Every structure is written in structure tokens, then in C-alpha cells.
Amino acid sequence: LFIDLKHSTNLRTTAKELDVPERRFVRFLIERRFVYRTASGNVLPYANVKNAGLFCVKDYYNHGHIGSYTLVTPQGKLYFAQLREMILLVS
């Protein structure tokens, strides 16, 4: 596994770093209540103690559109790397 511990990365890049399928990774995060999917389809972390330091949310404004996206912090990447085998078991 190659995990960049200097930068926070989006869910897709984090899944690639962990060598797990992106959809399976997101499904794991949703099932384990680390994140939830908004009505608009965004994936955002729950604000709870379990998630402290694992994620950060960035807001953006682009051509009149305002939105948010979730990044996994280096601490979060290490945490999910330890759960990699469990993530791979998600159907």
C-alpha cells in the first residue's frame, strides 16, 4: 500500500491508496456510520467523537455553484488502513 501521509485526499483517492474499490469503501463508511449521503448525493461525515480527526470538509464556490466535499485526513487514512480487511469483506 502507498498512503500519502502528508495530505488529506478525497474518498476516491483514499480508496485507491488503500487498494480497495471506491464503492465498497464508501458503502463501508456509510454502513458503519462514519458518513452519510445527503439528498444531493454528497457524502459528508457525521459530527461525532468517533470521527474526530478522521475527516475534514471543504466548501467550494464554482461558477455560481456552492458545495462541500469530504477529505480523509492522514490520521483517517492510517485508521482505515487498519480496517482494510474489514472493508474488503463488505458486499
Spell out what each predicted region is.
Residues F2, K6-R12, K16-S91:
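Positively charged, aromatic-accented nucleic-acid-binding surfaces
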